[in-house]
């Protein structure tokens, strides 16, 4: 390939020692491209009508040439998107990438937009779980004092979830990915303003190499791994991430035994239902994401990354275990012992963010004592 076409990448100096954990940004970009492409082809054949939506999905998978490929790539691609973004955030927490405040805050905004987009998309097939998940989650708006009921009616476009709701959810699901593209551009521009951090958390200005070919090949390897996994799941277990309830058409008269959102929202849903109060649960749900914004302002350690901070490492891996446990608990019915497990893990989840500054001070003291 001619050298001049790669000039843009060659002009981008990147830290020599960034590891595989730094590859997930480019993988997220690939996921976004895949979702917009497959989503466009699905939108060509989808009908946003409560009587026809479910049938149009069946039509896409059965009658449209390669429609099943597009539909499966889109639904499994969403799961891949969230796997990558959660790893991307975990890396940011571990290596304290959040100290680059603008990049971190734009990233959290991106996460919130992505979650909204995925939620709207989950409603579109108009299956049982789509309908009831939409009913339960949008109903949380009624917990807002004074404005709640008006806001919910405004969002629904009526007094219940019906045709206007599906139409506006489709419109929002179509437009929000372009907002994500814009925010991604902002995120990348802000990142290259200062440059990536690295596993040591040190200034790497004196030790940088061109992005291409060194890091671009490393990115390509992980990208190949992700695409292979995506196609393996699509070929051998296409319904791996789907809920069996969603294979039945939405019926407002029959409530599923256990209403739950897609797996990537289960941690937030688990926190929501662990609080036996509607407003309290809604606030906890919002805070489960919003609390990430506090990280740049509560960092007290003199050492940037957790590579050299064993106490923080312990808390970090506790957070990961907590995240997985909440996700698992949220798949279970609301009965003992799952209620208690959900409440304990929710407390543990928030305690990571609250004890982080205290741990930083403790580690600083320990380092001062040893020097």
Curated annotation (Swiss-Prot):
Protein name in the entry: Cytochrome b
One Gene Ontology term from the biological process aspect of the record: mitochondrial electron transport, ubiquinol to cytochrome c
Cofactor note: Binds 2 heme b groups non-covalently.
Similarity comment text for this entry: Belongs to the cytochrome b family.
Phylogenetic lineage: Eukaryota, Metazoa, Chordata, Craniata, Vertebrata
PANTHER family in alphabetical order: CYTOCHROME B
Pfam families, per database record: Cytochrom_B_C, Cytochrome_B
CDD domains, per database record: cytochrome_b_C, Cytochrome_b_N
Gene: MT-CYB
Known function: Component of the ubiquinol-cytochrome c reductase complex (complex III or cytochrome b-c1 complex) that is part of the mitochondrial respiratory chain. The b-c1 complex mediates electron transfer from ubiquinol to cytochrome c. Contributes to the generation of a proton gradient across the mitochondrial membrane that is then used for ATP synthesis.
Entry binding sites for heme b b566: 88, 187
Transmembrane portions of the chain: 24-44, 68-89, 104-124, 169-189, 217-237, 279-299, 311-331, 338-357
InterPro entries: Cyt_b/b6_C, Cyt_b/b6_C_sf, Cyt_b/b6_N, Cytb/b6-like_sf, Cytochrome_b, Cytochrome_b_C_euk/bac, Cytochrome_b_N_euk/bac, Di-haem_cyt_TM
Residue numbers binding a ubiquinone: 192
GO molecular function: metal ion binding; ubiquinol-cytochrome-c reductase activity
One Gene Ontology term, aspect cellular component: respiratory chain complex III
Subcellular location: Mitochondrion inner membrane
